Amino acid sequence: MNITQLWIYPIKSCGGVQLSEAKLGERGLEHDRQWMLVDREGNLITQREIPKLVWVRPSISDNELNVSAPDMPDLSLERSATGETKRVRVWGDHMDAFVLPQACEWFEGYTEREVDLVYIPDSSPRPMNPNFGTRHLTFVDGNPLHIISETSVAELNSRLEKPVGLERFRANIIFSDAEPYAEDTWTKISIDDIEFDVYEACQRCVMLN
């Protein structure tokens, strides 16, 4: 198995950032799904509700999160945040997150919705499924890392009238040189002497098509 691509998605349900190397932390790859958009009640907002979020392009530089989108001025934010907190929800999980008021006007202008951009610090607990471990999560759906095989997607595309790109699956680690769907049977993988448990298949949503 060879790793061919590394990706993070700093703002949940927005564009990804391809990396040449990544820092692995307690909650997964550094800055992956560490920000997200919520409505005034703290409920997660995704491309299901606002498809144009696909064109929001985050990037990380020095101590800033930079954001761009078509017909919008560039936005720069401090990577960490302090100040007002808000109780937010990712599916069935509730947690405290910092509100970034300086981003509110920008995202409301782009989405034409009342939204807040929030940030989850390492100090905010969000335990993963206790059947899988004791780690805490960012704003990911369920697990710290998502892997996918190029050969599995290639085999899938051989049976589709309209192929789907690897990027549609929004995985963190993309690898090659494995039999199609071999990852479905794995319980552990090792990368540079670091061992990872493979818990479950990731259920993808309508964003695939």
For the regions a protein language model found, what residue spans apply to each?
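Metal-cofactor-dependent catalytic cores
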Residues: 1-209
